[in-house]
């Protein structure tokens, strides 16, 4: 059964289609969008080996002229050098303004493909076909694209909404356990910031650390409710003028930890899990949140097999310094997303270095 979620925007609205066994229908889906005939399919070697032929065959059967390119996997390759390679391929294949880049992969592939599409010829079409849980519920939706700078995550980027997002839940069966767990961090995030019912459903599941232990109906809820939450928030605030900032819950400390470990030690979702633990405890210490609710959140993070402690030996002062490079800094103050109850958060710039240090020293 196909679920369709609409992302309603003033500029360009689009659909998120959640449909099992839909990868071989990608060509048909794109044909209905009235795009130009030239397509560049961007993936990584592992994903392309699993799904590349199916996607290319489907696109060609629908009449598209398809070129494909695989970028190395991993956050440390999310750089301007990789974008330059995509520009070279776009030039070789004479991509035009009516052409489309299709991102077939996880968050890194989606972010880079989106940024390349946003900047090639001042903007061409992009379609997101996420293959990880994290990308399905978060990064493929909303138009945030970009690459990392040596001093910070996603400091170089642009807003560029996709024309379409296609999610095939069956792809999750090929996902390594660690990648699945990383995606669960973003799912838990939605429960904390927006959807208390989703949070409750996650609590009722005995396990969240592996797909095979989660009931199919909960997997459906994880995908549809998470995508709906993201669509609701983005629909109200496309370019993070206010409300959309709540989607950064757990990401403030999380991004700093990723940067300090050179994007090698932790998956993005693992760092976000640590960041949610930190933000939750800061909220408790500021008397914004109940300790009991923070404990419920942390129990879910642990149940998903995610870390709740900082990596051993990580420099706390280094984290605090890295926070000053966070994209959400305004007038020199770090803006934190902090929960006030399950399903509700607030954004504040009143978190001091001492507040952060006190919590991190206990982690």
Swiss-Prot record:
Keywords for this protein: Amino-acid biosynthesis, Aromatic amino acid biosynthesis, Cobalt, Cytoplasm, Lyase, Metal-binding, NAD, Nucleotide-binding, Zinc
Pathway: Metabolic intermediate biosynthesis; chorismate biosynthesis; chorismate from D-erythrose 4-phosphate and phosphoenolpyruvate: step 2/7
Binding site for NAD(+): 107-111, 131-132, 144, 153
Sequence positions that bind Zn(2+): 186, 251, 268
Organism: Nostoc sp. (strain PCC 7120 / SAG 25.82 / UTEX 2576)
Gene Ontology process terms (BP): amino acid biosynthetic process; aromatic amino acid family biosynthetic process; chorismate biosynthetic process
PANTHER family: 3-DEHYDROQUINATE SYNTHASE, 3-DEHYDROQUINATE SYNTHASE, CHLOROPLASTIC
SUPFAM superfamilies named in the record: Dehydroquinate synthase-like
GO CC annotation terms, alphabetical: cytoplasm
GO MF term set: 3-dehydroquinate synthase activity; metal ion binding; nucleotide binding
Cofactor note: Binds 1 divalent metal cation per subunit. Can use either Co(2+) or Zn(2+).
Gene3D superfamilies named among the record's database cross-references: 3.40.50.1970, Dehydroquinate synthase-like - alpha domain
EC number of this enzyme: 4.2.3.4
Location of this chain's protein in the cell: Cytoplasm
Cofactor dependency: NAD(+); Co(2+); Zn(2+)
Protein name: 3-dehydroquinate synthase
């Amino acid at each position: 059964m196909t679920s369709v979620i609409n992302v309603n925007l003033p500029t360009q609205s689009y659909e998120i289609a959640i449909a099992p066994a839909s990868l071989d229908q990608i060509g048909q889906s794109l044909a209905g969008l009235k795009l130009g005939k030239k397509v560049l399919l961007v993936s990584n070697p592992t994903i392309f080996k699993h799904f590349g032929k199916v996607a290319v065959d489907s696109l060609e059967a629908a009449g598209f002229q398809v070129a494909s390119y695989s970028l190395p996997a991993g956050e440390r390759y999310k750089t301007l050098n990789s974008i330059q390679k995509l520009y070279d391929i776009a030039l070789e294949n004479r991509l035009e303004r009516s052409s489309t880049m299709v991102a077939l992969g996880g968050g890194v592939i989606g972010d880079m493909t989106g940024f390349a599409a946003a900047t090639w010829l001042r903007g061409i079409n992009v379609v997101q076909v996420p293959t990880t849980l994290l990308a399905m519920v978060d990064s493929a939706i909303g138009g945030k694209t970009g690459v990392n700078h040596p001093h910070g995550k996603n400091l170089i980027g642009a807003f560029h909404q996709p024309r379409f997002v296609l999610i095939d839940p069956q792809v999750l069966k090929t996902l390594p356990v660690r990648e699945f767990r990383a995606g669960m961090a973003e799912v838990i995030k939605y429960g904390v910031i927006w959807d208390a019912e989703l949070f409750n459903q996650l609590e009722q599941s005995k396990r969240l650390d592996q797909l095979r232990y989660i009931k199919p109906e909960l997997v459906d809820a994880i995908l549809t409710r998470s995508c709906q939450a993201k669509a609701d928030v983005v629909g109200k605030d496309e370019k993070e003028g206010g409300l959309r900032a709540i989607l950064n819950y757990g990401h403030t400390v999380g991004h700093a930890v990723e940067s300090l470990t050179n994007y090698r030690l932790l998956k993005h979702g693992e760092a976000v899990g640590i960041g949610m633990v930190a933000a939750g405890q800061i909220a408790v210490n500021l008397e914004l949140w109940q300790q009991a609710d923070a404990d419920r959140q942390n129990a879910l993070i642990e149940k998903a097999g995610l870390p709740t402690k900082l990596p051993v030996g990580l420099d706390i002062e280094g984290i605090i310094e890295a926070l000053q490079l966070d994209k959400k800094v305004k007038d020199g103050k770090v803006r934190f997303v902090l929960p006030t109850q399950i399903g509700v958060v607030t954004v504040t710039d009143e978190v001091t270095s001492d507040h952060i240090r006190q919590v991190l020293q206990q982690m």
